[in-house]
C-alpha cells in the first residue's frame, strides 16, 4: 500500500489565520483546530509533528509480493511505536504536517464553506487536495461525513483525488443518497469491477481506492459498497448500485474445497468466516432481496433454509445465522401481509403464472408450491398468516361451500353419514368418478373425513377382535380344547377369524397407499415426515405378525395332515406321535418361547398400540386438541434428549452395583443386583419407588460391602429421582410453555400440514377400497400409453425431416428462414413482456419498499435531523458571508465611481 507519508526534515512554520477568517468566525478556537489537525502537544500545541517513514518490507514480503503482509508488518511496527510513546501520541505520529493553506482547506471542507473551497480549488496551485488531518481523513472524506453535497461535487471534479471508495462507503453508511449519486458519477468507477471487488481485493490490484488512511479501510476489508448498503437497509442506494452492475456473490458451500476457499481458510480462517457472514447479511437484507431477485419470496425461503443449516454447522456463529434466517422469514411474512386481494395471495402461495389466474376459470387446483416449501423449511408465521390460512380454508372446503358455514353438529352428522355409507360412496365413485358425487368426494374435506372414518372402522375391528376375551378366557394356558378327537390343538388356535381377515384387508389397503406415497414423494421426502415412518412401522409390524401367524398355521396344518394320513385311532392321546407332530398338541404352557404364534401375538399387540397412537395424526384438525398434540410431540423429543443422560447414569450404577454384589448370589435378602437382569429391574423400578431398601442388605456380616451398597444406592436415587427427573419435568414444562405462548401459530402450522396432505389429486378412496382400481385408473393408464407412442412417433418424424432437409430448394429455405425470423421476433416480444406473476410481485415489492421507507422515517432519531439542519445552516452561513463580502466590494467600487464623477477636481489635484 502506498502511504503518501514523507519524512519531516524541519519543523513547519506556524501560520496564523487571515483576518478575513476571523471575520467569518473561523478564528474561534483556532488553536484547538491546529491541535486537532495533527500538531504535537508540545509548546502549547504549536509544534508540528515529525512523522516517521513507514517500515520497509522485508525480503520475504518482497519475494512474495503480498501487500497484505507488508501492511500487517507495518501496522505491527506502528503499534510498537505507539505503545512506547504512550496514548497521547496515538494519532500525532501518523499524519504529515499541514500548511496554513491545507488547514484552511480542510476546515472549509469540513464545515461546508463552499466559497472558500471553490476559490482555493480554482486559484491555488500549491494546494494538495489529498492532504489529511490528524485522523487521516482528506477533504473529500470530511465533506462526505458532514453531508456537504456542494463541496463533494467540487472536490470530485479534481483529478488524482484519493480515497473516493472510502467516501462512497461513508456516504452509504450515513444514507446520503445524493452524495452517493455524485460519487458514483466519478470516472473512477468506470473501471471494470470497481463496485464488485472488495476493498481487500482492490488493494491487492492497484491502490488505496477504498482506504480510510494508511492503516487500512474504514470497514471490514471484505465489505463492498452494495454489501454495506444492504447491511444498512438503504433501498435507494441498493437500487443505484444494482443499476451500476453491482452484485453480492453468494459464498461457496461451507465444505467447499476449491483453491480459493482453501487459500482463504489457510491464510486467515477468522477473516474468511467473517466475510461469509457479511456476505450473507447482505444477501438476507430485505433491501437486497426486494430489488435484486426476480422472485424474492422463493429466494428468501431458500436462503432462510440455507442459513438455518449453517447455524447448525458453524456453531460459533449460530446466533448470527439464526438471526439472518429469521430476517428472511420475516421478509416473506411482510410481503404476504401487503396482499390486497385473492389474486395476489394466490400468486405468492403458488409462485407461478398458472396459479396466479383465478382457479375457477381454469378448473384445476393450485400447486401451493410456496406453501409446501414454507412447511418444509418451517416458516411457521408465513403458513399461519391470516391471508394464507384464508386461502387454504377455501381450498379445504372446495365443492362444499355451504358446509363451511354450518355448525359443528351438522359437520359431525356429515362425518357419521360418510362413515356409515362409505361402501356405497365408494361404489358410486367407481361407477361415475366425474359426476357430482365424484367431485364432492374429491374435496379435501371429504377425503379427510373418508380416511378418518375408514381408520376409525379399522380401530373398531381391532377392538372387536379382542372383545371375546374382555371378561376372561375359559381355556387356561395348561388346557387344550379340540372340536373332535383327531384334531390337532394348534389347528384350532391358529385359524384366522373373519375379523382378522378384515383387519388383514385393511392393512393391505393402507400398505398400498403408503407404497404409492413413497413412489410419488421419493424415499428422502417420505422419511422426513415422522408420521410416515410411524405408519410404515405399524404396517410392517402388522404384516410380520400375520406372517408369523400364517407360518404357525401352516405348521399346524402339516401336523394335522400327518395325523389324518398316518393315525388310524380315533383318540390321539392313545397314540405316540413324532416329536415334531406331538409338539402341536401341547397346551400353551409347553410352547417354546420362539414359537411363531407367540411371536405373532407379541407383534400384534405392539401394532395395536401404534395403531391407536396414530389417532394423534388427525388431532390438529381441532383447535382444542391440536395444541395438546403438538405439546405431546415436543415432550417426546425432550424425553429422547433426556434419555442420553439417563442411560449414561443408569448404566454406570447398574454395572457398579452388579460388580459389587455379583459374588453374593444366594447370600442376599433378595436377588437384587446379583445378575445384570436383576440389577436392571431393581434400578429401573426404584425410579418409581417400587424397589426396597433391603435390596442392598447381605446375610453375611460384610458391613463394608453393605455400606458401599447403601451409599451407591442412595446416590443413585438422589441423582435419578431428585435431579434428573425434576430436570425432565422442567424441560417438558419449558416446551409446553413455548407452545402455549405461540399456540395459535403452532396449531395453524400443524393444521396446514394436515390439510396439504389431502390437497393433491389422488387418495380419493380410503383403504381398503383403494385396492380396487377404478375405471378412471384404466383410462389414465391407456392415455399414458397413447401419449408415449405419440411422442415416439414425433421423434421419428422429426428425424426424418432433418434427414430430408438437404434436398429442399433455396427458395423454401429462404421462406422458412424469413418465417422463423418473424416467429423469433414475435416470441422475443412475448418473452420481454412481464408475466402476470412478475407484475403482481412488482406491485407487492413496491408496497414493501414504500412501507419500509415510511417506517424508517418514523423511527429516525431527532438528533440526526437537528445535526443535518445545523450543517445546512453552517453552509448557508458561509454562502451569506461570501455574498456579503461580494456585495461590500461591489458597493465600494460603486462609491468610488460616484466619487470620481462628483469630485473630478479633487481627483486631479490628488
From Swiss-Prot:
One Gene Ontology term, aspect cellular component: plasma membrane
Residues given in the record as Ca(2+) 3 binding sites: 860, 863, 865
Membrane topology value: Multi-pass membrane protein
Pro residues biased stretches: 48-58
Lineage: Eukaryota, Metazoa, Chordata, Craniata, Vertebrata
Region named Disordered: 1-93
Family: Belongs to the transient receptor (TC 1.A.4) family. STrpC subfamily. TRPC3 sub-subfamily.
Entry-linked PANTHER family: SHORT TRANSIENT RECEPTOR POTENTIAL CHANNEL 3 (PTHR10117:SF8), TRANSIENT RECEPTOR POTENTIAL CHANNEL (PTHR10117)
Intervals, Extracellular compartment: 467-497, 552-595, 663-702
Domain description: The cytoplasmic portion of the protein is required for channel assembly and gating.
ANK repeat copies, ranges: 100-129, 135-164, 166-192, 221-250, 623-652
Catalysed conversion reaction: Ca(2+)(in) = Ca(2+)(out)
Organism: Mus musculus (Mouse)
Subunit (UniProt): Homotetramer. Interacts with ITPR1, ITPR3, MX1 and RNF24. Interacts with JPH2; the interaction is involved in maintaining Ca(2+) homeostasis in skeletal muscle and is mediated by JPH2 'Ser-165' phosphorylation.
Name of the featured protein: Short transient receptor potential channel 3
Keywords: ANK repeat, Calcium, Calcium channel, Calcium transport, Cell membrane, Glycoprotein, Ion channel, Ion transport, Membrane, Metal-binding, Repeat, Transmembrane, Transmembrane helix, Transport
Compartments, record wording: Cell membrane
UniProt record, GO biological process: positive regulation of calcium ion transport into cytosol; positive regulation of cardiac muscle hypertrophy in response to stress; response to ATP; response to calcium ion
